[in-house]
Structures are given as structure tokens and as C-alpha cells.
């Protein structure tokens, strides 16, 4: 009689990483032992994807509106160098994800993929579609999953509410927190969803689907490593004109490793602030830049959005020209800024990027489901890159402007 409450308790409070790994292994085992039984549990994966599909439009709308409405005045003036580094780094990350996807195209096995989209004819048609999606009725945009329209109306509402009373902003913030809590509940069922998705995928298509996931994971992790070890050090070098790698290694070791296991930029904020203190950075700078970075500095999320979106594109055989690819980089970097503070946030914004190519919401949400299957590693690596870069760029901006209290060790003053 006590078994069900115990299982529900473990599902709610246990390690989500271990649970997803267990669901992955259990799904593979069931598909190998009894393919028919594996197909019968496919509804668990379908139910999980439908839940995500239902909550994603509301989540994006509320979070973007709340973020813009509650934006603190004067942050741009005090934080301009850090903000520039954050935005440049996020855009370059999206661009690297796009380039990597073209160098090593990922093609997956998706249900109804052949009929799931209407490919655009080029950048002109993409912009034409984009324009009409922007002016869509907001209720219709929410009902149909038109993420471009949702983003536009949320931004407009956020700007309109920016000068509203603190009570209104507090209510909007409480609403966003409530929606985020609903998402967290849905995410807790990810292990069950992954179990159903993997069992059905292997029973239906064999191990070819998982091999496709391994290729996808290799492209994602390769792009993130390239950003962490090549692009970010180059950005820091251009800012401080000295060897960036002592600082890079310190940020990866003391911030990235912790973030990898917590899988939360918000949870890693105290770790980052302590590291900034050890580096001798001014508290009035990092006390603002670190929480801000946890919100908008999303290099890992930009890579995830661009790579998984182009995986859907290549799976469907959609031709993408250079201007459209650049537009995707921009959209992915902007969308990534809205992925903070939400479990699986970057995955839930994939439909926004997929809509540029006329890919249906059903197919886009299948890509989201694939993201959850590989999320045990992908989300951890993404968070590690996001969070460690917060400290890295804050330190780079402070060092470049001489905004350092004391030289902490040799990290701040090491020359090339």
C-alpha cells in the first residue's frame, strides 16, 4: 500500500540525472527483451511531449514579458562592457553551432517527418513568413504555438508594463514563477517520458535512432568545447591583451565543474560570486553581472537551439542558404537569453527557431523530446559553459577597465 507514495516521493525528490539515465537504460532493455511491450508504453513518451507542447507557449510569453517589464534601469550604463561580452559571446556560440551543424549534418529518425513541414524558398520567404507571424493575434499565437508571434507580443507587453507599479510587476513575477513551477513538475516526469520515447524508438527503428543521437551529442559537445577553449579565450585576449588561459582554466575548474553537476545557473550564482571575490573583482560589479549573466549569458543554450534546429532541418531535407543561417544564429542567440531559470529552457525554445524554416510544431517538439533523451549530458555541459562564462567575462571586463581590488594569486596579472 505504501509503494505508490514511495515511488512518487522518489520521483519528486530524487536525482533527475540518475532517473533519466535509469529511464534510458530501462527503455533500451524493454525494447530488446520485448519489442511489442516497448511499443505499448510509447504513450508515456507521447504524453510527456504533449505536456511540454502545451506549456511551452505560455512559458515563453510570461517569462519574456516579465523579464522586460522588471528590467532594472541603469544596468546598461554600469554594465556595458560586461553586457557587450555576454551578447557577443552568445551570438558567436550560436554561429559556431550553425557552422558545426553544416560541417557535420545530423539526421535523425522522426515520426511523420516527411509531412511535418513546408520548406521555405529562401531568405525572402523566411522574412515574409516572419513578418506575418509577428503580427499574429496573440491568443491565436498561444493556441497554435506561433513562437515568433508569442515573442513579439510578450516583448511589447513587457515594454508597456516596464513603467507600471511595483505591485503589477510583483504580480507578473509571481505568475512567471508559478508557470516555472508547473514546468518543473512536468520536467520531473522526464525519466518516464524518456523511458517511453527510447523504448518506442528502439522497438520501431532499432539502434539507428540512438546512433543518430550520439552523432548529435558529439556535435553539441564539440561546439561547446570549441567555445570554451578557443572562442572565449580569444574574446578575453582581445579584452585584456594577455594570456587568457589561466583565467579560463580557473573559471572552468571552480565554476564549470560545479555547474555541470547542479545543472542550474541560478544555483551556481553563489559559487560564481565567491570565485569573483577570490579573483579580487569589485563587489559592486560582480554582484550585478553574475545574476545578470545567469539570465542572459547563454552560450550553451544558443548552441543547443541552433544545433537541434538544424538537425530537424537536415532530417527533413530543407535547403538553407547563408542569409537564413545567419538569421538563425541571431534568433538562437536572442532566444537563448529567454532560456534562463527554467529546467529544459533551451529545449523548449527550439520550436521558435524551427518556425523560421516552416517546420511544424509537432516535428519541433519531437526534437525537444530528443533533447531530453540526451539531456543528461547536454544540459550539464550547457550549464557548465553558461555559468563559467559568467565569471570569465565579468573578470575580463573588470581587468580590462582596471576594476580590480587586489591581485588574487597570479590569475589577474599573468601576462602572455
UniProtKB/Swiss-Prot annotation:
It comes from the Bacteria. Keywords: Amino-acid transport, Cell inner membrane, Cell membrane, Membrane, Symport, Transmembrane, Transmembrane helix, Transport. One of its GO terms (molecular function) is neutral L-amino acid:sodium symporter activity. SUPFAM superfamilies: Proton glutamate symport protein. It is found in: Cell inner membrane. GO terms for cellular component: plasma membrane. The keyword Transmembrane helix applies. InterPro entries: Na-dicarboxylate_symporter, Na:dicarbo_symporter_sf, Ser_Thr_transp_SstT. It is a multi-pass membrane protein. The chain crosses the membrane at residues 14-34, 43-63, 82-102, 141-161, 192-212, 220-240, 298-318, 339-359, 363-383. It catalyses: L-serine(in) + Na(+)(in) = L-serine(out) + Na(+)(out); L-threonine(in) + Na(+)(in) = L-threonine(out) + Na(+)(out). Its main location: membrane. Belongs to the dicarboxylate/amino acid:cation symporter (DAACS) (TC 2.A.23) family. Involved in the import of serine and threonine into the cell, with the concomitant import of sodium (symport system). This is Serine/threonine transporter SstT. It comes from Laribacter hongkongensis (strain HLHK9). The lineage of its organism: Bacteria, Pseudomonadati, Pseudomonadota, Betaproteobacteria, Neisseriales.
Amino acid at each position: 500500500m505504501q509503494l505508490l507514495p514511495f515511488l512518487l516521493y522518489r520521483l519528486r525528490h530524487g536525482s533527475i540525472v540518475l532517473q533519466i539515465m535509469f529511464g534510458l537504460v530501462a527503455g533500451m532493455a524493454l525494447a530488446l527483451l520485448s519489442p511489442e511491450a516497448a511499443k505499448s508504453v510509447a504513450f508515456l513518451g507521447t504524453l510527456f511531449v504533449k505536456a511540454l507542447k502545451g506549456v511551452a507557449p505560455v512559458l515563453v510569453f510570461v517569462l519574456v514579458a516579465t523579464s522586460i517589464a522588471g528590467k532594472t534601469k541603469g544596468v546598461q550604463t554600469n554594465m556595458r562592457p560586461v553586457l557587450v561580452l555576454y551578447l557577443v559571446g552568445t551570438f558567436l556560440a550560436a554561429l559556431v553551432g550553425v557552422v558545426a551543424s553544416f560541417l557535420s549534418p545530423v539526421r535523425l529518425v522522426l515520426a511523420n517527418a516527411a509531412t511535418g513541414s513546408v520548406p521555405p524558398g529562401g531568405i525572402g520567404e523566411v522574412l515574409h513568413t516572419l513578418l506575418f507571424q509577428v503580427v499574429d493575434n496573440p491568443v491565436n499565437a498561444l493556441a497554435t504555438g506561433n513562437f515568433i508571434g508569442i515573442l513579439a507580443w510578450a516583448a511589447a507587453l513587457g515594454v508597456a508594463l516596464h513603467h507600471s507599479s511595483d505591485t503589477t510587476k510583483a504580480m507578473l513575477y509571481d505568475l512567471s514563477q508559478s508557470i516555472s513551477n508547473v514546468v518543473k513538475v512536468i520536467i520531473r516526469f522526464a525519466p518516464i517520458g524518456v523511458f517511453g520515447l527510447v523504448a518506442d524508438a528502439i522497438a520501431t527503428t532499432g539502434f539507428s535512432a540512438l546512433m543518430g543521437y550520439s552523432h548529435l551529442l558529439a556535435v553539441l559537445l564539440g561546439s561547446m568545447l570549441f567555445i570554451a577553449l578557443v572562442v572565449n579565450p580569444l574574446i578575453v585576449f582581445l579584452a585584456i591583451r594577455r594570456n587568457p588561459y589561466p583565467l579560463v582554466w580557473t573559471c572552468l575548474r571552480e565554476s564549470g565543474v560545479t555547474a555541470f553537476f547542479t545543472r542550474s545557473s541560478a544555483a551556481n550564482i553563489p559559487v560564481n560570486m565567491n570565485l569573483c571575490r577570490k579573483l579580487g573583482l569589485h563587489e559592486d560589479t560582480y554582484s550585478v553581472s553574475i545574476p545578470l549573466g545567469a539570465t542572459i549569458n547563454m552560450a550553451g543554450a544558443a548552441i543547443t537551439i541552433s544545433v537541434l534546429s538544424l538537425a530537424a532541418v537536415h532530417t527533413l531535407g530543407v535547403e538553407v542558404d547563408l542569409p537564413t543561417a545567419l538569421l538563425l544564429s541571431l534568433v538562437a542567440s536572442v532566444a537563448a537569453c529567454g532560456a534562463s531559470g527554467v529546467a529544459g529552457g533551451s529545449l523548449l525554445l527550439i520550436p521558435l527557431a524551427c518556425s523560421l524554416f516552416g517546420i511544424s510544431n509537432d516535428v519541433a517538439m519531437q526534437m525537444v523530446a530528443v533533447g531530453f533523451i540526451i539531456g543528461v549530458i547536454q544540459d550539464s555541459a550547457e550549464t557548465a559553459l553558461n555559468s563559467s562564462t559568467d565569471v570569465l567575462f565579468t573578470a575580463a571586463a573588470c581587468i580590462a577597465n582596471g576594476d580590480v581590488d587586489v591581485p588574487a594569486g597570479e590569475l589577474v596579472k599573468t601576462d602572455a
